[in-house]
Amino acid sequence: MFFFQHQNNDLTFKSRSIEHAYIAILNNDLASAEAVFKSIDSPRANWGVSLVQILNGFLERFPTYFEIRNFLEIDLDFLIKNDKIDYVESVLGALKILSGINQETYKYIARVMYENRFYNASREYLEKSKSIMYHDPEMHFMFAKYYLNDRDYQNASHYVNECLKILPDYYPAKQLKKEISKYWSL
């Protein structure tokens, strides 16, 4: 349990939790959020320290490859869904640094943008991802989804086929290819 803890059969509020830090972020109390993250020994909290520093505009603790992979999408989605637009802009402003650590960063951002229906932004980040890692099958799959949503069946077909050239047994792409074929002869 995160917000609460058991002590002698009593349930008490746990003030130093990951959730407490995220509530502090929502309340624009970045100093408290950082202090809470620093008091917790976990990969999520380590990422949280980096996130707060990104939100403050001064990154001292660089996140690891795996921290970016595991938490960037979740937290960007959290900030978008809670209308923390200034914080979203801060995260997006740090993408060049983050992509230097994890080359898949732009793909992660593209997925968050797509799922939040920011389709044009999603496409822009997919293009950046493509320029860095063309042979990423998931990136091609995401392009195919984007173009299918845009009813551009020719490009959707192209990208799903590119995905399957790289990873022939990728089940989601096989299923997407079937869906695209309803609209476009492959």
What are these regions (language model features)?
Residues 26, 55, 81, 115, ...:
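Register position in tetratricopeptide repeats
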